[in-house]
C-alpha cells in the first residue's frame, strides 16, 4: 500500500540549502515555516523557524513562534531541540540519542522519558514521516503513534506550477486521544523530488502548509 521507499538520507539534501513553506488558514496567508540545511563531512543539521499568527477583528487569537535544530550523524538522529511560544505559553523539547541503550532520551514540556529509535521528529521537511508508525512532537516531545494511508495519485496546482503528486492521510492510531491532540493530516507528496509539498488539516477552520521555495 505504501509507495514510498526512497529513503531520505542527508545526501538527498546535499544540494539543497533551504526550503520555505507558507502557512494559510482558510486560504489566508498567516505565516511561514522555513528549514535550513547544513551538511558537513560527518553531520547533517536542519534548523527551523516557524512563525504565524491568526487575527480576528485585528486581535491576535492564536500565534506560534518556534525555533528548532535537528542533528543527524550517519543518518541517525543524535540531537533535537526546539523552543516554542504558543499564545504566550512556552513549550520545549530536547531529544538525545542514547547509544548505549539504543533509544532516545526525551525531555519535553508534555513528555519526559524514553522513545524507541523508530520515532521521527514530526517536521514537514522529512518525508520519512510517511514511512513511520510513530513520531515525536517537534513542539512538546509527546510520542504519537500514527498510521499512513495512500489515497491516490493526482495532479495539483501549487503556486504557478502543476505537479504530479501522491496523496496520503496521516492520522493518530490512538482513538482515545482528545480530538485536538490527534494527528489528522492530508499530505501531498512529490515523489520526483522526494518532498512533501502540501499539508492540510482542520482545526477551527482549514489550515494548509504549502511548499513555496526550494533553494
Q: Where do the model's predicted regions map?
A:
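Hydrophobic, well-structured mid-protein blocks that either form specific transmembrane helices
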Residues: 82-122
